[in-house]
Each structure stands twice: as C-alpha cells, then as structure tokens.
C-alpha cells in the first residue's frame, strides 16, 4: 500500500486583528490587542466516482467539511426501563429522516451530522498595563464552533458489559429506578446494548473554550538604584500559564483533542515561573 492524494479540499478564511492604546499618561499605560480568525474548508472532489469515504466517527463527503461527523443519533435513556434509545433515521420518499425511537441498535442508522471538528472561530485577547515600575500582562485564548468525539468514553462506557474495566465516575448518575431522567443507562452485567461498542452522538461534545493562557506580573527596579551598582536594568517577574479555563464540556480538555477525537492527548499544563532579567 502507499499514500496518495485522492481528492481536493478547498479552504478559505479571514483574520482580523485590532490593537488599541486605551490610556497613555506619563506614569500609566494600557494597551489591548484582539484577534479572531475564521476558516472554512470543503471537500470538492474525491477519487473517481466516489462521493464519500467513511472513517470511524467521521466521513469525508463532497460538499462537507473535511472532518464532518457521521454516527448514530442517541435519543436518551428510557425513563421507565433504563435502556439506551436511538433514532432510527430511516429516510422517507422525500429524502427526510424519520425520527422514530428504538432500543434495538440494529434498527438505528448512522447519518451525516451538521457538526465538524474544525472550529468556526479561534482567537485571543491580550492586555498590557504599566504603572511606573510595575507591569501586568494577561492573554485569553478562545475557540468556538467545533466538536470532538470522546473516544476515551467509548472504551469505558460499557454499562456493565466488562466488569473488570474502569468505570467513569459519572456512572454514579446512571438510571436506577423507573422515572429517573439521566443520560446513562442501567448498569448491569451483559446489557442488551454494550454502549462501548456503539458510536453515538452521546459522546459528541462541543470544544468551545475560553482560557487564561498567560498572566505575567513584573517589577522593574528604578535605574537610579541599579546604576549605583553598575547595572543598567533589573526586572523581576512572575508568570503563570493556563491558570483558568471555561469549557462547554469539561470532562476533558478541549485542547487535548487531535483531529476531532479525544484520546490519549496531553492537556496544556498549568505552570508558574519566577525570574529575573539583568542587563549590564
């Protein structure tokens, strides 16, 4: 086997950056920079007569984004029985999906979803403030409009099918008695539908996030002091990365996702650094 190009993808986008000096006085200044970018891609052609190629939880389909999701639609848990439910998504004579609900997984059909891994917008917001000898800089990064499939969960959301495997902590909220409204099925040995063997939209999550990416506070020693000992400039600082994050889905880090799939990725680490800059 060998790698080769089997299609054409068209990308187009726009990027905007705005910088401003909000305040500027002798002793105090405040500067802001905001940027946002949007990129959209679309598969134009595939090899030969092909119009689509299915690949796990995604599909390469002409006219769609490169990482468009393709899977069975989860329809919740039956509140009376605790069994998982799915939309059948049969197609009527007009080409529309029929949203009947079934507990039989073999009657549910995977469909092309209007969701993709690529975010609609990414960007950042940074501010720098200075007052006499002190400076403060902080930057937020953000991302909106993308999705990821939780492959970690597919390995552990077995509902009792594998009693020797790890179990996610959220299974404590699984169905237990008639009337319970929950996203997680009755947990018992050898269930009729082993959810770890089924790719469904229950594990499809937004990757929207806002993160305090960097925060730095510094103090520059007045030159009247440093020049007395033959030093031109001394700056002390403390810097931190990834101190705070808001995420639409917070069970895993949205930046630990690769290609629309959450599996084995390492999230950005929280770090704190102290330092000194000296110029002679």
Regions found by a protein language model. Give the residues of each.
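Extracytoplasmic gating/loop element in the C-terminal half of outer-membrane beta-barrel translocons
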Residues: 143-236, 240
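Membrane-embedded beta-strand positions of outer-membrane beta-barrel proteins
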Residues: 32-34, 138, 236-238, 276
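Transmembrane beta-barrel architecture of outer-membrane proteins
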Residues: 10-14, 36-42, 118-123, 142-144, ...
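Conserved small-residue
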Residues: 4-10, 14, 21-117, 157
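Outer-membrane beta-barrel and related beta-rich outer-membrane complex signature
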Residues: 30, 41-57, 145-175, 246-254
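Transmembrane beta-strands of outer-membrane beta-barrel pores
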Residues: 20-22, 36-42, 131-133, 142-146, ...
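C-terminal beta-signal and terminal closure region of outer-membrane beta-barrel proteins
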Residues: 3-11, 56-83, 174-180, 245-280
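Repeated loop/turn-to-beta-strand initiation elements of outer-membrane beta-barrel proteins
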Residues: 26, 133-138, 224-225
């Amino acid at each position: 086997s060998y790698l080769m190009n089997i299609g054409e993808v068209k990308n187009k986008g726009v990027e905007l950056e705005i910088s401003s000096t909000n305040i500027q006085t002798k002793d105090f200044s405040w500067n802001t920079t905001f940027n946002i970018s949007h990129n959209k891609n679309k598969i134009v052609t595939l090899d030969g007569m092909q119009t689509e190629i299915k690949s796990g939880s995604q599909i390469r389909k002409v006219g769609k984004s490169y990482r468009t999701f393709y899977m069975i639609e989860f329809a919740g848990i039956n509140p009376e029985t605790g069994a998982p439910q799915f939309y059948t998504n049969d197609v009527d004579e007009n080409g529309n999906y029929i949203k009947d609900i079934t507990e039989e997984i073999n009657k549910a059909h995977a469909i092309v979803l209007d969701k993709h891994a690529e975010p609609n917008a990414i960007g950042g917001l940074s501010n720098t403030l200075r007052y006499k000898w002190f400076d403060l800089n902080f930057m937020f990064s953000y991302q909106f409009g993308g999705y990821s499939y939780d492959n970690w969960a597919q390995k552990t959301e077995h509902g009792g099918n594998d009693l020797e495997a790890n179990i996610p902590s959220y299974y404590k909220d699984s169905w237990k008695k008639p009337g319970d409204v929950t996203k997680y099925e009755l947990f018992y040995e050898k269930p009729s539908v082993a959810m770890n063997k089924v790719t469904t939209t229950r594990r499809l999550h937004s990757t929207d996030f806002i993160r305090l990416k960097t925060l730095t506070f510094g103090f520059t020693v007045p030159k009247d002091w440093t020049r007395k000992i033959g030093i031109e400039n001394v700056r002390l600082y403390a810097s931190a990365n990834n101190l705070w994050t808001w995420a639409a889905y917070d069970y895993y880090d949205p930046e630990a996702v690769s290609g629309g799939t959450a599996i084995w990725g390492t999230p950005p680490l929280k770090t704190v650094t102290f330092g000194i800059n000296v110029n002679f």
